[in-house]
């Protein structure tokens, strides 16, 4: 039986918001079965809860943001990605600000945080969203697509006219499992170009950005002293983002995802298109005594 998972203990972290630059206190708490992932703005009076739901996405410019009852939660994708990677279904995320902390720009610190809290199995089967028919969305030359597949596979292709991102390092595929996610995807950082900085600052974006939490490129090279963590870190980060964006569907995906120059907006459009097409997907679970799911999660981490 593949059971739902939550945290064993409450755990806290502090950081800055990538776009707001605000200091933010974050607390992750265990949650009961079928609760799902819910963000809680504890700085508001009264406190407002914002479920991790693709239908609540209102912001897709350089991050994924949710709005519910007037309360915003920005830059959810890296934590959502870590939760998906470790198979966590139920958690309460308390925040003292409208944006999650960026940490080092990857989901690695969130993975460490979740493992430190401990992950426990709950007494109910985990629910998966099984893709039954292809679903595709396009925007110009950008494409995002789901197809039926026995497991969870992600493929992504980026196209940047930059010497540090040659064509041979612009494609990545991953057969999803916790170990593959942690090793191959979780440490890939967000990235940005110096030329875009002015655009971002004019829109009050990237105010908390620095080389401590992003890969920064000028016209020719990577400016970070330590260089890259993977030769194709850029496309790996796009997969990290996609895993987080797709987890807003409300369950773990069983299917194949393909992205070509996709981003937060198109990923969200794909999830909405999928959920709107009742014939294209179904809920499935794997209760005790039935077949094993075609996706491997790590054994629970008892902190």
UniProtKB/Swiss-Prot annotation:
Keywords, sorted A to Z: Hydrolase, Lipid A biosynthesis, Lipid biosynthesis, Lipid metabolism, Metal-binding, Zinc
Residues given in the record as Zn(2+) binding sites: 78, 237, 241
Pathway the protein takes part in: Glycolipid biosynthesis; lipid IV(A) biosynthesis; lipid IV(A) from (3R)-3-hydroxytetradecanoyl-[acyl-carrier-protein] and UDP-N-acetyl-alpha-D-glucosamine: step 2/6
Cofactor(s) it depends on: Zn(2+)
Annotated Pfam families: LpxC
GO molecular function: metal ion binding; UDP-3-O-acyl-N-acetylglucosamine deacetylase activity
Residues the record marks as active site: 264 (proton donor)
InterPro entries registered for this protein in UniProt: Ribosomal_Su5_D2-typ_SF (IPR020568), UDP-acyl_GlcNac_deAcase (IPR004463), UDP-acyl_GlcNac_deAcase_C (IPR011334), UDP-acyl_N-AcGlcN_deAcase_N (IPR015870)
Family annotation (Gene3D superfamilies): lpxc deacetylase, domain 1 (3.30.230.20), lpxc deacetylase, domain 2 (3.30.1700.10)
EC number: 3.5.1.108
Family classification: Belongs to the LpxC family.
Function of the protein: Catalyzes the hydrolysis of UDP-3-O-myristoyl-N-acetylglucosamine to form UDP-3-O-myristoylglucosamine and acetate, the committed step in lipid A biosynthesis.
Protein name: UDP-3-O-acyl-N-acetylglucosamine deacetylase
Native source species: Xanthomonas campestris pv. campestris (strain ATCC 33913 / DSM 3586 / NCPPB 528 / LMG 568 / P 25)
Gene of this entry: lpxC
């Amino acid at each position: 039986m593949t059971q739902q998972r939550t945290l064993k203990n409450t755990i806290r972290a502090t950081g800055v918001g990538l776009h707001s630059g605000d200091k933010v206190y974050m607390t992750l708490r265990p949650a009961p079965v079928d609760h799902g992932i819910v963000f809680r703005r504890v700085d508001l009076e009264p406190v407002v809860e914002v479920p991790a739901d693709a239908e609540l996405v209102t912001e897709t410019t350089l991050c994924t943001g949710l709005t519910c009852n007037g309360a915003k939660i920005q830059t959810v994708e890296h934590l959502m990605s870590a939760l998906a990677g470790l198979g966590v279904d139920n958690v309460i995320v308390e925040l003292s600000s409208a944006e999650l902390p960026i940490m080092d720009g990857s989901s690695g610190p969130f993975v460490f945080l979740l493992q430190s809290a401990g992950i426990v199995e709950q007494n109910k089967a985990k629910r998966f969203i099984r893709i039954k028919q292809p679903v595709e969305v396009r925007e110009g030359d950008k494409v995002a697509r789901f197809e039926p597949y026995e497991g969870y596979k992600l493929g992504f292709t980026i196209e940047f006219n930059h010497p540090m991102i040659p064509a041979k390092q612009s494609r990545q595929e991953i057969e999803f499992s916790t170990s593959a996610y942690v090793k191959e995807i979780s440490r890939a950082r967000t990235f940005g170009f110096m030329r875009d900085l002015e655009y971002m600052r004019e829109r009050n974006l990237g105010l908390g950005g620095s080389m401590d939490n992003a890969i920064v490129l000028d016209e020719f090279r990577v400016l970070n002293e330590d260089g890259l963590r993977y030769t194709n870190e850029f496309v790996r980060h796009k997969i990290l983002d996609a895993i987080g964006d797709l987890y807003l569907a409300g369950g773990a995906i069983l299917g194949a995802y393909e992205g070509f120059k996709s981003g937060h907006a198109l990923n969200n459009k794909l999830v909405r298109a999928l959920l709107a097409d009742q014939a294209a997907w179904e809920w499935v679970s794997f209760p005790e005594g039935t077949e094993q799911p075609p996706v491997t999660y790590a054994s629970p981490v008892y902190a």
